Amino acid sequence: MSARLGEGERFDVVGLCHALNELFGEGEQALERRAALLEEALAIVKPGGSTVVIEPALRDTSRDLLAVRDRIVARGYAVRAPCFYRGSCPALVRESDWCHADHAWRAPSLVEDLARAAGLRRESLKMSYLVLAPKGEAWREPPAGRVFRIVSEPLEGKGRQRYIGCGPEGRVGLALQQKHRTAANAAFFELRRGDVVRVSEAEPRGDGLALTDRSEISVLARAGDPAQG
């Protein structure tokens, strides 16, 4: 790749959009070759720059991207987004899980017309993605406190709201009962996939965390925005 782009050239951003999953077939060998290609892309990124990978939000393509992510992380690269967790991706533990983003989007009129004619809905853009740092750059420190990126839709149950969050401690269920709703935690009931939140006063419950009337929820970033704080 670097030879085709020109000897010694460096770029602020190198992007691969709906391309990686189309290359090298299937299986472990394909994943290894995709990881090697990403290393080539990262080698031509300037310090402080990024390689951005965007793939379809389907389960299989997403899980393949996460498997490539694990290989890249194992080789010493840092993920700028969406990951806070620095180990092997916890979404790969269960075959039914995957990770994708869902961003609200106002389509151009031409796209709206085509979508309407095809019977499609295009109120949002769904994708699986990685933003990777070049070799030698450290993981960015997450915001202070107990921080999670919401990686599910709202999982409503009888008298409660639940989400899956993924943060520095891994993938965790977060739940809050309506009877424990307060002004300090009310934002929990309005979260969207991709939001970054800070949680306080949460209690371990089963394989997740239960929020109480003492809990506070701070929204540090909405989906697609950089996390601050």
Model-derived regions: residue spans:
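S-adenosyl-L-methionine
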Residues: M1-G8
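A short SAM/SAH-binding and catalytic strip from SAM-dependent methyltransferases
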Residues: F11-E32
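Short beta-strands and strand-loop turn motifs
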Residues: C17-H18, V52-E55
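Short catalytic/ligand-binding loop motif for oxyanion handling, primarily in non-cytosolic enzymes
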Residues: E22-F24, D60-S62, S88-C89
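A short glycine-rich, Lys/Arg-flanked "PGG" loop and its adjoining helix->strand segment in the class I
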Residues: E28-V53
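Short strand-turn motif at the edge of the Rossmann-like AdoMet-binding core
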Residues: I54-L58, C83-F84
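Conserved Class I S-adenosyl-L-methionine
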Residues: D64-S88, V93-R106
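C-terminal lobe and adjacent flexible extensions of AdoMet/dcAdoMet transferase-like proteins
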Residues: W98-G229
